[in-house]
């Protein structure tokens, strides 16, 4: 049975309303983005961020994930980076730089060695309007983060990264499976 256009518009409206509710809630609770709720949800389920965690947040701006981490991590280290500027967050070292540059990765390695417990990446490529191309470009960023994470994560380290469903999804999933003992996907 084919959905009517009205039903499709209604679903789009419901999705926007749901997202808007998270936007409003994030602002009322002082979070910089609604992405904060996803990290809270994941950490409540898996408890991978603890008070002594060493955490790297890639693609951090505007800082929702770093905010959440800073409320939990009191004895560890948080390093956040993004090409865009980000307002200061207590107990977070922020660097405005390009993760893909060798000098940035060398700096991260110098600060963390292979002692990071958690790597977060909410990086997304700038959108072009071409959904397929945008998906591929963002998933390539995810693949770069997967490769780099293997250099700085401890043996039981955790990587949380944005990944889009698209034509290269299975390739990136396979790469993650080669590099990590356990791979799970969440929406």
What are the residue ranges of the model-derived segments?
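S-adenosyl-L-methionine
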Residues: 83-128
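Glycine-centered, small-residue-biased loops immediately flanking beta-strands
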Residues: 53, 76, 157
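Conserved class I S-adenosyl-L-methionine
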Residues: 51-61
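Short beta-strand "acidic-cap" motif of Rossmann-like dinucleotide-binding folds
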Residues: 78-80
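Helix-to-beta-strand junctions that scaffold the AdoMet/dcAdoMet cofactor pocket
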Residues: 50, 73-74, 153-154
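C-terminal substrate-binding/active-site "lid" region of AdoMet-derived donor-dependent transferases
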Residues: 56, 89-92, 104, 119, ...
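Class I SAM-dependent methyltransferase Rossmann-like catalytic core
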Residues: 1-51
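Conserved SAM-binding loop of SAM-dependent methyltransferases across substrates and taxa
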Residues: 62-74
């Amino acid at each position: 049975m084919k959905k009517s256009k009205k039903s499709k518009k209604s679903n789009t409206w419901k999705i926007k309303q749901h997202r808007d509710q998270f936007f409003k809630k994030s602002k009322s609770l002082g979070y910089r983005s609604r992405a904060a709720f996803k990290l809270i949800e994941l950490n409540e389920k898996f408890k991978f961020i603890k008070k002594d965690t060493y955490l790297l947040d890639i693609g951090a701006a505007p800082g929702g994930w770093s905010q959440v981490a800073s409320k939990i991590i009191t004895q560890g280290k948080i390093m956040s980076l993004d090409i865009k500027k980000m307002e200061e967050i207590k107990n977070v070292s922020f660097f405005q730089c390009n993760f893909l540059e060798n000098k940035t990765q060398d700096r991260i390695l110098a600060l963390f060695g292979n002692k990071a417990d958690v790597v977060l990446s909410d990086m997304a490529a700038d959108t072009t309007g071409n959904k397929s191309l945008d998906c591929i470009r963002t998933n390539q960023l995810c693949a770069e983060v997967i490769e780099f994470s293997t250099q700085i994560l401890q043996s039981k380290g955790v990587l949380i990264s944005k990944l889009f469903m698209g034509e290269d999804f299975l390739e990136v999933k396979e790469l993650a499976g080669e590099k990590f003992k356990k791979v799970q996907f969440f929406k």
